[in-house]
Amino acid sequence: MSDEEHHFEPAADAGASKTYPQQAGTIRKNGYIVIKSRPCKVVEVSTSKTGKHGHAKCHFVAIDIFNGKKLEDIVPSSHNCDVPHVNRTDYQLIDISEDGFVSLLTDNGSTKDDLKLPTDDSLLTQIKDGFADGKDLVVSVMSAMGEEQICALKDIGPK
């Protein structure tokens, strides 16, 4: 045994899991599920009866919460599925940079400058037009599995 002390650099994040397990049979419509490593919102669930050999199966149809793609998965109802931790936070829009990044005001008064404008055309147009008109805009940012994206907009009146 050595008398040397070992110093370990802590990792940047707290090591919190991006997902948690939930039994497939308990996941409902409008819930969340991870399919093909993507966080999704469940739009349809159907369950098949137990066969001669095996389990009842759950058929999930879900929409990726960030890119809107439809994904499907079939899982035995007694098995666990990964469910993403999904958070939605509102920030006040301060500025839009020329390279497509937004500057947002957080609750504690600091700014968040690492988010790009959304890819959804109608939302993008609403944000740009509202900002150009000098309106006070609040954007909702959805975050899950290490990804973040602006998903909604609220107009709280003129500045």
Curated annotation (Swiss-Prot):
PANTHER family documented for this protein: TRANSLATION INITIATION FACTOR 5A FAMILY MEMBER (PTHR11673)
UniProt region (Disordered), positions on chain: 1-21
Gene Ontology annotations of biological process type: positive regulation of translational elongation; positive regulation of translational termination
Entry similarity comment: Belongs to the eIF-5A family.
UniProt biased composition (Basic and acidic residues): 1-10
UniProt-listed Pfam families: eIF-5a, IF5A-like_N
Protein name as it appears in the record: Eukaryotic translation initiation factor 5A-2
GO function terms (MF aspect): ribosome binding; RNA binding; translation elongation factor activity; translation initiation factor activity
Stored Gene3D superfamilies: 2.30.30.30, Nucleic acid-binding proteins (2.40.50.140)
UniProtKB keywords: Hypusine, Initiation factor, Protein biosynthesis
Domain of life of the source: Eukaryota
Hypusine sites (modified residues): K52
Post-translational modification: Lys-52 undergoes hypusination, a unique post-translational modification that consists in the addition of a butylamino group from spermidine to lysine side chain, leading to the formation of the unusual amino acid hypusine. eIF-5As are the only known proteins to undergo this modification, which is essential for their function.
Function summary: Translation factor that promotes translation elongation and termination, particularly upon ribosome stalling at specific amino acid sequence contexts. Binds between the exit (E) and peptidyl (P) site of the ribosome and promotes rescue of stalled ribosome: specifically required for efficient translation of polyproline-containing peptides as well as other motifs that stall the ribosome. Acts as a ribosome quality control (RQC) cofactor by joining the RQC complex to facilitate peptidyl transfer during CAT tailing step.
Database matches in SMART domains: eIF-5a (SM01376)
